[in-house]
C-alpha cells in the first residue's frame, strides 16, 4: 500500500493522451491479476450500482444527485468536458463489443452523454481521450449480448458455481481486450505518452446470501458488492503492482484524467488523484433511482443513497418500503435472474433480504461514519432529470433483453 498523488509517485509532469477502459459489471475482487500487476490500483466506490447513472458520473465527475441522470432515457445537460472535442483535442467513445443490438448513434451511453456517435481508436489523432465501454463480465455470462437474452439464458444456465466461474472467465476475457488495445497503442507509438485507466461502472451480485438475499445481477440494492470496483492507472513511471491507499469514487476519474493532460477540470464532485491524496477519513457517495413502468404508471421501486468510507458505509432507503420489498421478491422469483436466485435464496435468505429491503437505514462493514453523520450528509432530496426522452419500442425491447428494464 502506497500513498501520494499519482504525479508524485510516477515522477511525470503529465501525459499527452488518455485511454479509459470501462469493463462493465466488474467487481473489485474480480480484477484480473494481469491488470493489477501492470499499474497502480485504488479501491473505488461506484457512483451508482448500474450503467444508466454511473457512466454519466464517470465521464462528468459528478454524482447522480448532481447530474440527475437516473434512467436510460435521461440526458446530461451538456456533453462532459472530458469528451468535449476542441480544436486541439480529439475525443472518442467506443462500445463496439457492447449494446450490439443498437445502431451506433442510438447506443444508450452515446445518447446520455450527448455524443454524436462512436469513434474508433484508429480515427482519432493525438492529443486525445479515448473511452472504450466493454461488455466485461456483464450477464449473460459466457456469451455475447447479441447471442443470448438475459432471461432465457438463465433458464438454460442456472448452476450458481458454474455461473460464478463464467463471470470470472468473462473478467479475464475483458482483460485480454484491454491488453490488446495497449499493444495497439504501443505499435502506434502512443503508449509512452498515454495515461491508461482500467475501471468499471459498477459491480455484480453473484448469489450472496444473508441480507443480500441470494440476489444476482445489479441495479439494486446499494451494497459493497455492487459499488466496490477497481481503478487501475497504467503509464510511464506509474508504479506497477501497487495499491494506492485510501478510497476513490467513480467521480474522481474525469478530474484525474483532465489534470494529467493539463486540461481545465471545471466544477466536479470528485477529486484530482493526479495531484491530490485522498484524506484518510474521506467519505464518498452513491445514489440510485430505479423506476419501473407497470399498471399504466411509473413506480419508484428502489430509491436509495449511500455514504461510504474505506471500511464500509451507510445506506439510506427512500420512498416506499412495500415497493422495495416487492421488487426484491420479483427479482428473486420472477425476474430474469430468478433461475439461479432460486438456488441461492432459501428461507433464511428470503427473510434476511426482505428485512434489509424494508429497513430505512442499513450499515455495512466497520465504517467510522456514525448514523447521525450519514443522516446529515444524505438529507437532500433527489431530483428528476429535466432532460429526458421517450424510448422507442425497439430500444425498450433491447434493454429488456439485457435485463435492464
From Swiss-Prot:
InterPro entries: Alkaline_phosphatase_core_sf, Sulfatase, Sulfatase_N. Pathway: Protein modification; protein glycosylation; Cell surface structure biogenesis; S-layer biogenesis. Pfam families: Sulfatase. Transmembrane segments: none annotated. Disruption phenotype: Impaired formation of the tetrasaccharide present at 'Asn-532' of S-layer glycoprotein Csg with formation of a tetrasaccharide that is not sulfated. No effect on 'Asn-47' and 'Asn-117' glycosylation of S-layer glycoprotein Csg. One of its GO terms (biological process) is protein glycosylation. Its EC number is 2.8.2.-. Coiled coil: none annotated. SUPFAM superfamilies: Alkaline phosphatase-like. Ca(2+) binds at residues 24, 201-202. GO terms for molecular function: arylsulfatase activity; metal ion binding; transferase activity. It comes from the Archaea. The keyword rRNA processing does not apply. Keywords: Calcium, Metal-binding, Transferase. Binds 1 Ca(2+) ion per subunit. Its cofactor is Ca(2+). Belongs to the sulfatase family. Involved in N-glycan biosynthetic pathway that takes place under low-salt conditions (1.75 M instead of 3.4 M). Participates in the formation of the tetrasaccharide present at 'Asn-532' of S-layer glycoprotein Csg, consisting of a sulfated hexose, 2 hexoses and rhamnose. Mediates sulfation of sugar 1 in the tetrasaccharide. PANTHER family: ARYLSULFATASE, ARYLSULFATASE FAMILY MEMBER. This is Low-salt glycan biosynthesis sulfotransferase Agl7. It comes from Haloferax volcanii (strain ATCC 29605 / DSM 3757 / JCM 8879 / NBRC 14742 / NCIMB 2012 / VKM B-1768 / DS2) (Halobacterium volcanii). The gene is agl7.
Amino acid at each position: 500500500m502506497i500513498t501520494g498523488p499519482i504525479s508524485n509517485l510516477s515522477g511525470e509532469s503529465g501525459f499527452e493522451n488518455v485511454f479509459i477502459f470501462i469493463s462493465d459489471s466488474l467487481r473489485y475482487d474480480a480484477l484480473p491479476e494481469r491488470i493489477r500487476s501492470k499499474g497502480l490500483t485504488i479501491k473505488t466506490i461506484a457512483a451508482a450500482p448500474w450503467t444508466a447513472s454511473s457512466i454519466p458520473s464517470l465521464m462528468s465527475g459528478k454524482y447522480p444527485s448532481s447530474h440527475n441522470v437516473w434512467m436510460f432515457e435521461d440526458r446530461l445537460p451538456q456533453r462532459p468536458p472530458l469528451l468535449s472535442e476542441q480544436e486541439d483535442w480529439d475525443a472518442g467513445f467506443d462500445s463496439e463489443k457492447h449494446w450490439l443490438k443498437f445502431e451506433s448513434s442510438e447506443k444508450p451511453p452515446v445518447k446520455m452523454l450527448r455524443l454524436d456517435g462512436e469513434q474508433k481508436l484508429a480515427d482519432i489523432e493525438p492529443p486525445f481521450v479515448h473511452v472504450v465501454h466493454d461488455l466485461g463480465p456483464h450477464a449473460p455470462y459466457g456469451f455475447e449480448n447479441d447471442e443470448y437474452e438475459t432471461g432465457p439464458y438463465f433458464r438454460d444456465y442456472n448452476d450458481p458455481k458454474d455461473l460464478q466461474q463464467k463471470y470470472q472467465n468473462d473478467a479475464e476475457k475483458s482483460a485480454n481486450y484491454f491488453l490488446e488495445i495497449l499493444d495497439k497503442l504501443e505499435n502506434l507509438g502512443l503508449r509512452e505518452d498515454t495515461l491508461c485507466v482500467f475501471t468499471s461502472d459498477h459491480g455484480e451480485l453473484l448469489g450472496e446470501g444473508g441480507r443480500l438475499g441470494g440476489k444476482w445481477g445489479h441495479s439494486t440494492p446499494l451494497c459493497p458488492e455492487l459499488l466496490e470496483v477497481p481503478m487501475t492507472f497504467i503509464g510511464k513511471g506509474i508504479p506497477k503492482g501497487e495499491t494506492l491507499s485510501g478510497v476513490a469514487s467513480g467521480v474522481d476519474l474525469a478530474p484525474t484524467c483532465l489534470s494529467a493532460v493539463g486540461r481545465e477540470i471545471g466544477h466536479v464532485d470528485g477529486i484530482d488523484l493526479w495531484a491530490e491524496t485522498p484524506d484518510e477519513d474521506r467519505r464518498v457517495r452513491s445514489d440510485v433511482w430505479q423506476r419501473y413502468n407497470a399498471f399504466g404508471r411509473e413506480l419508484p421501486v428502489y430509491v436509495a443513497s449511500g455514504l461510504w468510507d474505506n471500511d464500509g458505509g451507510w445506506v439510506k432507503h427512500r420512498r416506499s418500503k412495500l415497493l422495495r420489498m416487492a421488487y426484491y421478491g420479483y427479482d428473486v422469483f420472477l425476474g430474469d435472474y430468478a433461475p439461479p436466485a432460486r438456488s441461492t435464496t432459501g428461507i433464511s435468505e428470503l427473510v434476511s433480504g426482505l428485512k434489509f429491503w424494508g429497513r430505512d437505514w442499513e450499515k455495512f462493514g466497520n465504517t467510522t461514519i456514525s448514523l447521525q453523520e450519514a443522516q446529515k450528509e444524505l438529507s437532500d432530496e433527489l431530483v428528476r432529470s429535466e432532460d429526458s426522452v421517450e424510448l422507442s419500442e425497439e430500444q425498450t425491447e433491447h434493454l429488456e433483453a439485457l435485463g435492464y428494464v
